[in-house]
Amino acid sequence: ELGVIVPPVHIRDDLRLAPGGYRVLLSGVVVALGQVHAHRLLALDPTGTATRGLPGEVTTEPTFGLPAKWITPTERSRAEAAGCTVVDATAVIATHLAELIRRHAHELLGRREAQELLEVAGKTDGKVIEELIPHLMSTGDVIKVLRSLLREGVSIRDLRTILEALADHAGAIKNPD
């Protein structure tokens, strides 16, 4: 979505966490925690009132902080009829990871990943890259610009347009941060 090459996600069991608990680390730092129940479904209740009559464990959805309730699969149709979106534990974790990748994309773009993107772009737009790097900007400065765009939530998928804009305006850029 943002044009970043996502590094592999390593999954390890951690007996220090509660059953069903998970945490996400980025460069060794915890960036998120969550809790899932393998044989239950999460009924997302944006109004905070739709799940009142449903049996289950009240919780907060980990990605966006919405009111929710862990329910049994037999309660799914009641929850959906009440206006809830119902998802399984796998979807909860996948959504959480996808959002964390979006929020931290600028931290995931290292020099190696950026170089891979530039090499791929070079196969189709080599002239722009030749013109830009190193004559107008260093590779490091281009990476800083790409990270800044990602920090702002701007996709770098259309790298050609970004590189062309940098080549056109490199002389006016004083600080690529």
Q: Language-model segments: which ranges?
A:
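Membrane-embedded alpha-helical signal segments
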Residues: 1-177
